[in-house]
């Protein structure tokens, strides 16, 4: 089913929110749902979609994100999701700065293509530890060099775990992918308030479409 522009924006926002929610979850608890993680990381490799739904496995990859958008914008449940919102704002700011640095964007695109080729040759899933490690290094070498850097808060025992830090960086890359899509769809932060009703209605329609 073809989505309208507002519904596409709602889907991109869900992808962004879900990725940032998982960043917070890994940093605080060391855990992330495998299905939610897969939905986020797979989106990184969908660089030439026919439609927005393709980026998120026909929308099924961001079910959690759609629910989170309802909680945050619909119920104004800000306090419970404060860290997620903080990361969302940080990623949107980072994505804007990346767009102003074409060389980094080209390096990011080339790196994603190389990792995708490695995946295909070795038949690896997006959540394979080797793939996550490669995504983590790509983030460090590209987006991670842009100042000011996104600061992650969490439990030190989880942040000291190498695999957790790799998952966090890979998820930040997934968040950037959704932020790029949000910008391409002419998404603006002001729409969260001024266009909140339209976004929520679109979010609800998309949720029903993929259910």
Regions found by a protein language model. Give the residues of each.
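Leu/Val/Ala/Ile-rich N-terminal alpha-helices, chiefly Sec-type signal peptides and the beginnings
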Residues: 1-74
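Charged, amphipathic alpha-helical oligomerization/scaffolding segments
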Residues: 11, 15-18, 22, 86, ...
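Charged/polar positions within long, soluble alpha-helices
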Residues: 21, 25-28, 96, 100-103, ...
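Structured alpha-helical bundle/scaffold domains in large eukaryotic membrane-trafficking regulators
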Residues: 28-35, 154, 187-194
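Beta-strand-enriched cores of mature, soluble protein domains
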Residues: 37-47, 146-151, 156, 181
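Long amphipathic alpha-helical segments with strong coiled-coil/leucine-zipper propensity
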Residues: 45-126
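A mid-sequence, solvent-exposed acidic-amphipathic segment
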Residues: 125-165
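Alpha-helical oligomerization segments
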Residues: 167-211
């Amino acid at each position: 089913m073809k989505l309208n522009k507002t519904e596409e924006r709602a889907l991109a926002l869900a992808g962004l929110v879900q990725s940032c929610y998982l960043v917070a979850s890994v940093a605080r608890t060391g855990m992330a749902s495998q299905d939610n993680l897969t939905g986020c990381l797979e989106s990184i490799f969908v660089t030439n979609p026919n439609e927005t739904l393709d980026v998120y496995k026909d929308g099924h990859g961001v079910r959690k994100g759609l629910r989170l958008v309802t909680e945050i914008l619909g119920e104004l449940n800000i306090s419970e999701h404060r860290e997620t919102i903080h990361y969302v704002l940080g990623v949107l700011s980072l994505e804007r700065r990346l767009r102003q640095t074409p060389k980094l964007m080209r390096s990011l695109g080339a790196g994603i293509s190389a990792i995708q080729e490695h995946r295909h040759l070795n038949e690896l899933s997006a959540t394979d530890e080797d793939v996550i490690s490669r995504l983590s290094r790509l983030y460090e070498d590209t987006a991670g060099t842009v100042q000011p850097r996104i600061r992650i808060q969490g439990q030190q025992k989880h942040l000291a775990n190498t695999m957790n830090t790799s998952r966090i960086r890979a998820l930040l890359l997934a968040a950037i992918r959704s932020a790029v899509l949000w910008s391409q769809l002419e998404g603006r932060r002001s729409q969260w308030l001024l266009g909140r009703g339209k976004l929520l209605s679109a979010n609800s329609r998309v949720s029903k479409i993929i259910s």
